Amino acid sequence: MSKRESAKYKIDRRLGENIWGRPKSPVNKREYGPGQHGQRRKGKLSDFGLQLRAKQKLKGHYGDVSEKQFRKVYEEADRRKGDTSENLIGLLESRLDAVVYRAKFVPTIFAARQFVNHGHVNVNGKRVNIGSYRCKPGDVIEVREKSKQLVIVLESVGLAERDVPDYIEADHNKMVATFSRIPGLADVPFAVQMEPNLVVEFYSR
């Protein structure tokens, strides 16, 4: 495994879970964390520990979003009408880098952020290079013409390990996707259980 690949698995190793469902994740081979003390049996987590872990998993899944940025998303979710935990998932899934990842234009959420930042993506015909850009239902996301033959794109489309969720309509021949609607927790194909309700409890302390 290259240094670059190893770095991408550090979140899996830290949490002891394969949070993206990737076949090469090191936690597929062991059920303990890294380091010389990794094999020690983990004690029962406190309520705070469970809340913190839920936050770390959700942040990690979206590419280790910074605490400042993640809290900002939470605060917006809390201001909106409805269930805060469902709002939180909807806002995170509306990020442009998340949509690019879910559409299978690239293989990982980290690659999606870099892909967007490097200007390979148009939204409604205009280049957008901000991974946290908020997509709205009906937005059309397209890989720019010169980027459609990049190896990372061609390899990702053929990945069998994940499917495109039904709130995104993707045409891999044209490399175009439409963000159809804002999803809820039950709609998102998380590889492990996510508990946004515990994240809400963490920030509500």
Curated annotation (Swiss-Prot):
Signal peptide bounds: none
GO biological process: ribosomal small subunit biogenesis; translation
Domain named S4 RNA-binding: residues: 94-157
Assigned keywords, A-Z: Ribonucleoprotein, Ribosomal protein, RNA-binding, rRNA-binding
Listed GO CC annotations: small ribosomal subunit
NCBIfam families for this protein: PRK05327.1 (NF003717), rpsD_bact (TIGR01017)
Function comment: One of the primary rRNA binding proteins, it binds directly to 16S rRNA where it nucleates assembly of the body of the 30S subunit.
Protein name: Small ribosomal subunit protein uS4
Gene name for this UniProt entry: rpsD
